[in-house]
Amino acid sequence: MKQYLELCRRIVSEGEWVANERTGKRCLTVINADLEYDVANNQFPLITTRKSYWKAAIAEFLGYIRGYDNAADFRALGTKTWDANANENAAWLANPHRRGVDDMGRVYGVQGRAWRKPNGETIDQLRKIVNNLTKGIDDRGEILTFFNPGEFDLGCLRPCMHTHTFSLVGDTLHLTSYQRSCDVPLGLNFNQIQVFTFLALMAQITGKKAGKAYHKIVNAHIYEDQLELMRDVQLKREPFPLPKLEINPDIKTLEDLETWVTMDDFKVVGYQSHEPIKYPFSV
């Protein structure tokens, strides 16, 4: 929680205004932010200075793990996070590759589970990583990436948190996640939950101990219509201690994550928070 608030204060005090063409808004911006999450000791990085809806964040990443490409599938898991980008993004609505209502195109999990080769075959990046880690193998290339410039025109949004690298040291698994751009008041709340949970899940299904998760952000920003709420409301609040995340121990394989797992298999214990803050979302 401390490192999150320090980043917010850094943006408010040191950030520079940058115009964002996609949204038509200005962003108070800093370059390079490093966050670290202690998964080994279950220090779940859930924002406490405003109420955080953690289930939607985990549901979204579960959708990525399953390779979903439709906002309706994400809604069925319990999150509406893709509704706007799939159905209200002007550029995507005009894109001839869009296949109708709720279609997201070849984004995020589609690339992770079915990266297309020139011959038309696909690569399941996640399956390869799980197989290797289960066998105790770290080839220094246990990398899951959603960033495929050759298919940006086939999706509604370029990935923000785009690459996840796993490192196995002995029987302890670590994760380094890379993010090109981060809406700190809204997006980071989700992203840090996802980084933590991804490592916890991967350690569980590969039979390894979870270590630390490292979260590297290039462009961290606060939109101009979010600044007042961040500066005058959220940063005035004192944080509560971090809660813990409980994951159903019956989740043992990638197939489990692909099939029967729901949000009922996750529980947060000891969560205290201040009142919600409704930050504007930029499509």
UniProtKB/Swiss-Prot annotation:
Its primary localisation, in coarse terms, equals cytoplasm
Which domain of life does the UniProt lineage start with? Answer: Bacteria
Q: Name one GO molecular function term.
A: thymidylate synthase activity
> A GO BP term, please?
methylation
Task: Write down the Pfam families for this protein, in alphabetical order.
Answer: Thymidylat_synt
**Entry coiled-coil feature ranges:** none
Which residues does UniProt mark as catalytic?
Answer: C160 (nucleophile)
Name the pathway: Pyrimidine metabolism; dTTP biosynthesis
| A GO CC term assigned to this protein in UniProt | cytosol
Where does it reside?
A: Cytoplasm
State the UniProt keywords alphabetically.
Cytoplasm, Methyltransferase, Nucleotide biosynthesis, Transferase
UniProt: (6R)-5,10-methylene-5,6,7,8-tetrahydrofolate binding residues? D183, S282
> Which reaction is the catalytic activity of this chain?
dUMP + (6R)-5,10-methylene-5,6,7,8-tetrahydrofolate = 7,8-dihydrofolate + dTMP
Entry's InterPro entries?
Thymidate_synth/dCMP_Mease, Thymidate_synth/dCMP_Mease_dom, Thymidate_synth/dCMP_Mease_sf, Thymidylate_synthase, Thymidylate_synthase_AS
The EC number(s) given in the record are: 2.1.1.45
| Enzyme class, first EC level, given as a word | transferase
Subunit details: Homodimer.
Q: Which family does it belong to?
A: Belongs to the thymidylate synthase family. Bacterial-type ThyA subfamily.
The protein here is known as Thymidylate synthase
Gene responsible for this protein: thyA
